[in-house]
UniProtKB/Swiss-Prot annotation:
Pathology noted in the entry: Neuropathy, ataxia, and retinitis pigmentosa: A syndrome characterized by variable combination of developmental delay, psychomotor retardation, hearing loss, optic atrophy and retinitis pigmentosa, dementia, seizures, ataxia, proximal neurogenic muscle weakness, and sensory neuropathy. Leber hereditary optic neuropathy: A maternally inherited form of Leber hereditary optic neuropathy, a mitochondrial disease resulting in bilateral painless loss of central vision due to selective degeneration of the retinal ganglion cells and their axons. The disorder shows incomplete penetrance and male predominance. Cardiac conduction defects and neurological defects have also been described in some LHON patients. LHON results from primary mitochondrial DNA mutations affecting the respiratory chain complexes.
Domain of life, per lineage: Eukaryota
A GO cellular component entry from the record: mitochondrion
Self-association and partners: Component of the ATP synthase complex composed at least of ATP5F1A/subunit alpha, ATP5F1B/subunit beta, ATP5MC1/subunit c (homooctomer), MT-ATP6/subunit a, MT-ATP8/subunit 8, ATP5ME/subunit e, ATP5MF/subunit f, ATP5MG/subunit g, ATP5MK/subunit k, ATP5MJ/subunit j, ATP5F1C/subunit gamma, ATP5F1D/subunit delta, ATP5F1E/subunit epsilon, ATP5PF/subunit F6, ATP5PB/subunit b, ATP5PD/subunit d, ATP5PO/subunit OSCP.
Protein name according to UniProt: ATP synthase F(0) complex subunit a
Length: 226
């Protein structure tokens, strides 16, 4: 049972080669561009969502921070598309892998921190010691603030991994219960199947919300350092 339960989180291989690279490259192919296609409802909706997301993310930033607009919009589209594709049956979700989420979180976090130290080093150092701190607490507070800064990318990655993994496990368990009850009690099967449908709708919302939260936190880190 445990092996079957966690089998969907094992990175698949094709001819002995990891298929994760192909899976990661697949989501951008689902986003059409108006350069080659005539504008239709899909492209219009896509452009509207991109503009809305860009406006929400970039309102708080100055001119230097807005140079990240393309990266942040690309990030939220990539994570959202990857999460949604992972909800398909017999598919693999790369965002359930902590290693991949760390590979996204660490460079983005490091980029914002480096930008802060390069452009506003005094303000960046001031975050480690808030104004008015009592003298005896200064050494400990500097250590605490340093640790809180260093765990930011880990918090980003763990939050995304935990939420997506928990949803997939719950869907797997309820789906297995639906199949098991189908030969025992039909009314109970219908009730469990209804719960599964509602949970699937909830997981679609979670997939989109987690993409937004991940990108929003990166945007906030950028705002603090520009």
């Amino acid at each position: 049972m445990n092996e079957n339960l966690f089998a969907s989180f094992i990175a698949p291989t094709i001819l002995g080669l990891p298929a994760a690279v192909l899976i990661i490259l697949f989501p951008p192919l689902l986003i059409p561009t108006s350069k080659y296609l005539i504008n239709n409802r899909l492209i219009t909706t896509q452009q509207w969502l991109i503009k809305l997301t860009s406006k929400q993310m970039m309102t708080m930033h100055n001119t230097k921070g807005r140079t990240w607009s393309l990266m942040l919009v690309s990030l939220i589209i990539f994570i959202a598309t990857t999460n949604l594709l992972g909800l398909l049956p017999h598919s693999f979700t790369p965002t359930t892998q902590l290693s991949m989420n760390l590979a996204m979180a660490i460079p983005l976090w490091a980029g914002t921190v480096i930008m802060g130290f390069r452009s506003k080093i005094k303000n960046a150092l001031a975050h480690f010691l808030p104004q008015g701190t009592p003298t005896p607490l200064i050494p400990m507070l500097v250590i605490i603030e340093t640790i809180s800064l260093l765990i930011q990318p880990m918090a980003l990655a763990v939050r995304l991994t935990a939420n997506i993994t928990a949803g997939h496990l719950l869907m797997h368990l309820i789906g297995s219960a639906t199949l098991a009850m189908s030969t025992i009690n039909l009314p109970s099967t219908l009730i469990i199947f209804t719960i599964l449908i509602l949970l699937t709708i909830l997981e679609i919302a979670v997939a989109l919300i987690q993409a937004y939260v991940f990108t929003l936190l990166v945007s906030l880190y950028l705002h603090d350092n520009t």
